[in-house]
């Protein structure tokens, strides 16, 4: 089967990998000059299977109002006349009930835990390395109320078989020794020993190279996808800046831009671009730097360790497709890394970056078939595209081949929004 994949971020390239390993003839097109040059370029670096949690959680509507007046709030909303933003926020708030949170959390962990198995196997099969570390994730709590709230997540983790351990303040250094340099700052933490860290951009580029050299995947860069044309319930072709492209099957992996492409096909994807920021700092003191990933629960900022760099990612900004770099957001994530690892990296030499996360109102990705029998979706992963990429792609490849997938796909395709 000839398959055309639209998008060469981490989700598109992993989709190409799993489809090609099943014997399909795969072509990937992207408007950029290389793989992983947009959202996959500078993300936080955490591969956080156990930490996969919905943004839409009980109490978030009240917190969102409070955050509007805080300087270093994890969520910022740029005032705009944007009906799509209003619809997204309303739908997200509707998912903030305990019942919806539990359903969405289970779906996310289902995909994420499968993705852990898939990326471990991929690493063994291909031998690619991407400054990766398999040393877990530590969620840091500054307040006792956060420790109490973590109990709900821990119950879901237990039900899903995810290893975890609640640490007291004095135990945090067993997971991250550098925290000994900031005593009294945190009251506890949740340690997820099976979570991982790695450079998503490097992973995607090296996997694309592997796909080209060993699996015969064709990559066409600098090609702008303009529209999809249909006929009699099927996609007939994709019109691009380089002409029309035809295949037996088509996969949309365009992140935040996916809804713009498929809306003319009467497919409504409730995906909204949520802007995130990151800093990349050179390590100056190995003993004062993180060894894996820590997540500051108060500011929703992740701090991850690569070989000789620290990646700091955070902030959720609703500003449509605006990619301007705001110094106020830099100040927030810079403040957090200086507060947690004050001696670990050189903030003066940091690279500042922003990208658009493709968020769904229930935080769950959209994976599977559409009303067109040769059009498939693998998109809407929000902040967890890196975490869920391999599992999502393997699931998609099995569904496209008519195989029974390793995990239950119920509740993951676009039909869940039809009600």
From Swiss-Prot:
* The reaction(s) this protein catalyses: a D-alpha-amino acid + A + H2O = a 2-oxocarboxylate + AH2 + NH4(+)
Q: Does the keyword RNA-binding apply?
A: no
Give the GO biological process terms: D-alanine catabolic process
Q: Where does FAD bind?
A: 3-17
Q: Which SUPFAM superfamilies match?
A: FAD-linked reductases, C-terminal domain, FAD/NAD(P)-binding domain
Instruction: Look up the EC number in the record and give it.
Output: 1.4.99.-
What's the domain of life for this entry?
Answer: Bacteria
Pathway entry: Amino-acid degradation; D-alanine degradation; NH(3) and pyruvate from D-alanine: step 1/1
| GO-annotated molecular function | D-amino-acid dehydrogenase activity
Q: Which cofactor does it need?
A: FAD
Q: Keyword annotations for this protein?
A: FAD, Flavoprotein, Oxidoreductase
What are its GO cellular component terms? Answer: cytoplasm; plasma membrane
Q: What does this protein do?
A: Oxidative deamination of D-amino acids.
UniProt family annotation: Belongs to the DadA oxidoreductase family.
The record's NCBIfam families line, in alphabetical order, gives: PRK00711.1 (NF001933)
Q: What is this protein called?
A: D-amino acid dehydrogenase
Q: Which organism is it from?
A: Chromohalobacter salexigens (strain ATCC BAA-138 / DSM 3043 / CIP 106854 / NCIMB 13768 / 1H11)
Lineage, uppermost ranks: Bacteria, Pseudomonadati, Pseudomonadota, Gammaproteobacteria, Oceanospirillales
């Amino acid at each position: 089967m000839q398959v055309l994949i639209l998008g060469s971020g981490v989700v598109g390239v992993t989709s190409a990998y799993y489809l090609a390993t099943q014997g399909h003839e795969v072509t990937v097109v992207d408007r950029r000059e290389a793989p992983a040059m947009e959202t996959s370029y500078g993300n936080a670096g955490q591969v956080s299977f156990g930490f996969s949690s919905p943004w839409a959680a009980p109490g978030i509507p009240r917190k969102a109002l409070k955050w509007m007046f805080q300087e270093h709030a994890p969520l910022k909303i740029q005032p705009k006349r944007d009906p799509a933003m209003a619809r997204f926020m309303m739908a997200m708030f509707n998912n903030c009930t305990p019942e919806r949170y539990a359903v969405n959390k289970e779906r996310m962990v289902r995909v994420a835990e499968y993705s852990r198995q898939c990326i471990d196997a991929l690493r063994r099969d291909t031998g690619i390395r991407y400054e990766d570390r398999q040393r877990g994730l530590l969620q840091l709590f500054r307040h006792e109320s956060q420790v109490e709230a973590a109990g709900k997540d821990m119950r879901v983790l237990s039900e899903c078989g995810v290893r975890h351990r609640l640490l007291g303040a004095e135990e945090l250094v067993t997971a991250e020794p550098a925290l000994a340099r900031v005593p009294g700052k945190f009251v506890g933490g949740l340690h997820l020993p099976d979570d991982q860290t790695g450079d998503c951009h490097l992973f995607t580029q090296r996997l694309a190279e592997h796909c080209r050299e060993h699996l015969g995947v064709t990559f066409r860069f600098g090609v702008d996808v303009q529209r999809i044309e249909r006929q009699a319930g099927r996609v007939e072709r994709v019109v691009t800046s380089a002409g029309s492209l035809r295949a037996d099957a088509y996969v949309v992996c365009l992140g935040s831009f996916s809804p713009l492409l498929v809306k003319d096909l009467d497919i409504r994807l409730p995906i909204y671009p949520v802007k995130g920021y990151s800093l990349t700092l050179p390590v100056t003191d190995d003993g004062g730097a993180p060894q894996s990933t820590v997540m500051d629960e108060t500011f929703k900022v992740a701090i991850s360790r690569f070989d000789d760099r620290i990646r700091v990612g955070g902030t959720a900004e609703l500003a449509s497709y605006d990619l301007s770099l705001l110094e106020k957001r830099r100040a927030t994530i810079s403040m957090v890394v200086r507060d947690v690892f004050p001696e670990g990296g050189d903030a003066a030499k940091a690279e500042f970056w922003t990208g658009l996360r493709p968020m769904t109102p229930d935080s769950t990705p959209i994976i599977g078939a559409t009303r067109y029998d040769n059009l498939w979706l693998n998109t809407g992963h929000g902040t967890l595209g890196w975490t869920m990429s391999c599992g999502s792609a393997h699931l998609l490849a099995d569904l496209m081949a008519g195989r029974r997938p390793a995990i239950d796909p119920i509740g993951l395709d676009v039909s869940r929004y039809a009600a």
